[in-house]
């Protein structure tokens, strides 16, 4: 019977998607379609009576604590594997933190140190798992360092060795294709900065730029291996010798200093071929040192005169020349340097400079100094320019010296244009008083009373001064001219003229036209308008309009005086007066 059940055929139900035996398929299909339904979301068969409960409990939307919305049936898996706010243990301190903050906490927690019970060193917490492999190996290195005291070299040359390090970088940049290798120079700087003492750390005032770089370079060179005491002794002697040679060329032009430096290095390299080469180099250190009278620095006796010549502030440094040639009798620095590089295969140059075998030269950006023209690396250029010997006292010193001061320059002042002055009718011209004084000196030509000055017009009868002299030969008498008076005087004149016109003329008096010479300048414009026929035509009409009682005799008198001179004769009379 069991074999019959296993070997029977099955058929897939379309409703519940299950395999049903063929002999029972009809009954199952009827029951399944009546009682079982398929979930439209998960496509799983469920009883139709439980479909609503299934949708409410499994497929409803819920919000996770990370603000992500998902179905309720997926929430558990999300919280265990995907949620960023799920809790996790720190691998160093076993503290539970959210996954978002776990990485920052592990970086901070792993940076703590703990004392190793075996070697007695402080080890980082993150390195505790790998520390047993290297525990005890650093003790031997410490013993080697303790064998060489930090002040093994001469204390008096300590600050100057810092200067030599900067000079070596300048020498390294003289010829970029043939520069010294980087590794020997870094090894020298490592030896220099690791051997600094507490007194040298307080030299901020004398060497500010070097002291700023010491801390970082010390950290980089702290774990590097050191040389043996024997090599260190020779290195110190060679560096002292190089210091004396470098101080010789301190104040000279860069081209001459470089030539002398390379020449002496070449001679020293040749001298090392003999058995007494090291003794000669050490003998140079024991020479008599004398202070310079300008900078008060110590220099060898035979080099003091050359240094004082260049150190004298009254002597100007020669200008820099890019294409300058070497002096006669001195080899080209490039040829000397190439020769040194060829001979360095035997270890002579390395032993002289205190360098070991080096790697190939690395590529770097080389930029010339804007003050001395020496080519330096990009990371060293800024610090070199800050302490360059040829840098002026101020940034704009060389610019301000070439420009003369404002007080010494001739002040260019353009003549001020005369202001245009509005001249009124009653104003006097500038040359009128001078002309009047000259005419007064010649003699009085006007019958004015002695009790009144010529310019005073206080009495109404004498407002108009007339000329008693006759007409000149060849010239016609000029017509009378009106005077511009002030307001009070003009009112008095008008009143006097009205009274004279109203009254009858004295018997036997014949009115005559006397040519009047004006006391005011010729460019004076009368206050009353001029008519084309005569000067007093408009005035007579205006007077007649103001005073209707003017007699015909007065009107005829005015007309005769107005017609006494034609316009042409008037122009001729004015020109004659201007010539006087």
From Swiss-Prot:
Secretion signal span: none
Modification sites for Phosphoserine: 190, 326, 414, 429, 469
UniProt xrefs under PANTHER family: TRAF-TYPE ZINC FINGER DOMAIN-CONTAINING PROTEIN 1 (PTHR16295:SF19), TRAF-TYPE ZINC FINGER PROTEIN-RELATED (PTHR16295)
Gene from which this protein is expressed: TRAFD1
Biased composition (Polar residues): 197-209
Zinc finger extent (TRAF-type): 27-103
Modified residues (N-acetylalanine): 2
Highest taxon in the source lineage: Eukaryota
Gene3D superfamilies referenced in this protein's UniProt entry, alphabetically: Zinc/RING finger domain, C3HC4 (zinc finger)
GO molecular function per UniProt: zinc ion binding
GO biological process per UniProt: negative regulation of innate immune response
Protein name: TRAF-type zinc finger domain-containing protein 1
Feature: compositional bias, Basic and acidic residues: 216-235, 409-419
Stated role: Negative feedback regulator that controls excessive innate immune responses. Regulates both Toll-like receptor 4 (TLR4) and DDX58/RIG1-like helicases (RLH) pathways. May inhibit the LTR pathway by direct interaction with TRAF6 and attenuation of NF-kappa-B activation. May negatively regulate the RLH pathway downstream from MAVS and upstream of NF-kappa-B and IRF3.
A single GO cellular-component term on record: mitochondrion
Biased composition (Low complexity): 453-463
Key words, A-Z: Acetylation, Metal-binding, Phosphoprotein, Zinc, Zinc-finger
Organism placement in taxonomy: Eukaryota, Metazoa, Chordata, Craniata, Vertebrata
Record's subunit section: Interacts with MAVS, TICAM1, TRAF1, TRAF2, TRAF3 and TRAF6.
């Amino acid at each position: 019977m069991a074999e019959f059940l296993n070997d029977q055929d099955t058929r897939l139900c379309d409703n519940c998607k299950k395999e049903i035996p063929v002999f029972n398929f009809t009954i199952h299909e009827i029951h399944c379609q009546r009682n079982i339904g398929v979930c439209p979301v998960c496509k799983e068969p469920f009883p139709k009576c439980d479909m609503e409960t299934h949708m409410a409990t499994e497929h409803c939307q819920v919000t996770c604590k990370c603000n992500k919305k998902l179905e309720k049936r997926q929430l558990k898996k999300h919280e265990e594997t995907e949620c960023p706010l799920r809790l996790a243990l720190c691998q160093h301190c076993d503290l539970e933190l959210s996954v978002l903050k776990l990485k920052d906490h592990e970086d901070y927690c792993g940076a703590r140190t703990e004392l190793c019970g075996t070697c007695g060193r402080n080890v980082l917490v993150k390195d505790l798992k790998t520390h047993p492999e290297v525990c005890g190996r650093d003790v031997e290195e410490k013993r080697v360092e303790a064998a060489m005291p930090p002040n093994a070299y001469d204390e008096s040359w300590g600050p100057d060795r810092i200067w030599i390090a900067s000079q070596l970088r300048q020498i390294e940049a003289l010829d970029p294709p043939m520069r010294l290798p980087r590794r020997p120079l870094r090894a020298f700087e490592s030896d220099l900065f690791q051997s600094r003492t507490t007194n040298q750390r307080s030299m901020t005032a004398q060497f500010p730029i070097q002291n700023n770089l010491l801390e970082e370079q010390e950290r980089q060179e702290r774990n590097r291996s050191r040389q043996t005491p024997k090599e260190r002794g020779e290195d110190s002697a060679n560096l002292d010798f190089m210091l004396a040679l470098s101080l010789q060329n301190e104040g000279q032009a860069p081209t001459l200093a470089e030539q002398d430096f390379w020449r002496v290095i070449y001679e020293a390299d040749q001298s090392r071929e003999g058995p007494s080469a090291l003794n000669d180099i050490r003998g140079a250190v024991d020479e008599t040192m004398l202070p310079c009278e300008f900078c008060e620095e110590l220099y060898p006796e035979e080099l003091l005169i050359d240094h004082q010549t260049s150190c004298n502030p009254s002597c100007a440094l020669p200008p820099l020349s890019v294409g300058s040639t070497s002096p006669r009798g001195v080899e080209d620095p490039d040829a000397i340097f190439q020769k040194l590089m060829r001979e360095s295969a035997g270890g002579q140059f390395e032993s002289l400079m205190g360098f070991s075998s080096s790697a190939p030269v690395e590529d770097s950006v080389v930029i010339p100094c804007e003050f001395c023209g020496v080519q330096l690396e990009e990371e060293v250029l800024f610090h070199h320019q800050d302490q360059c010997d040829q840098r002026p006292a101020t940034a704009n010193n060389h610019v301000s010296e070439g420009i003369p001061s404002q007080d010494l320059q001739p002040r260019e002042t353009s003549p001020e244009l005369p202001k245009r002055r509005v001249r009124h009718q009653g104003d006097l011209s500038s040359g009128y008083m001078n002309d009047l004084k000259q005419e007064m000196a010649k003699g009085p030509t006007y019958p004015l009373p002695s009790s009144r000055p010529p310019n005073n017009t206080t009495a109404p009868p004498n407002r108009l001064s007339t000329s008693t002299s006759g007409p000149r030969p060849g010239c016609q008498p000029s017509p009378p001219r009106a005077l511009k008076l002030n307001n009070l005087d003009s009112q008095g004149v008008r009143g006097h003229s009205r009274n004279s016109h109203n009254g009858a003329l004295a018997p036997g008096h014949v009115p005559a036209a006397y040519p009047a010479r004006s006391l005011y300048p010729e460019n004076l414009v009368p206050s009353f308008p001029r008519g084309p026929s005569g000067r007093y035509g408009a005035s007579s009409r205006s007077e007649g309009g103001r005073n209707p009682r003017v007699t015909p005799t007065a009107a005829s008198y005015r007309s005769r005086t107005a017609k006494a001179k034609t316009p042409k004769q008037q122009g001729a009379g004015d020109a004659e007066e201007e010539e006087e």
